[in-house]
A protein has these predicted regions:
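A short, Lys/Arg-rich alpha-helix, primarily the initiator
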Residues: 1-20
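Short, charged recognition helix plus adjacent turn
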Residues: 9, 14-15, 34, 59-70
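Alpha-helical residues within the helix-turn-helix
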Residues: 12, 23, 51
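Recognition helix of helix-turn-helix/homeodomain-like DNA-binding domains
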Residues: 26-41
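DNA major-groove recognition helix of helix-turn-helix/homeodomain DNA-binding modules
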Residues: 44-60
């Protein structure tokens, strides 16, 4: 999973902007665009993003790493 792209997808699905996310985590808007380009993120940063977007990125990453056997 490209976590940066996934963050961007979730943000867009929620109808929110990069500027909004920047104000919430907080950082500069240009940094948010850099986040979108990253394949991995620092755990603390991903935690802040998860909280403000109310989305469990950690669960999705875990499910990708350890898929359930059917």
């Amino acid at each position: 999973m490209n976590i940066g792209k996934h963050v961007e997808e979730i943000l867009r699905k929620q109808g929110r902007s990069a500027s909004w996310l920047a104000s919430q985590i907080p950082c500069e808007r240009t940094n948010v665009y850099n986040i979108f380009k990253r394949k991995s993120l620092d755990v603390r940063l991903l935690m802040r993003i998860s909280v403000v977007l109310e989305h469990d990125f950690f669960k999705e990453l875990s499910e990708e790493a350890f898929p359930r056997k059917r």
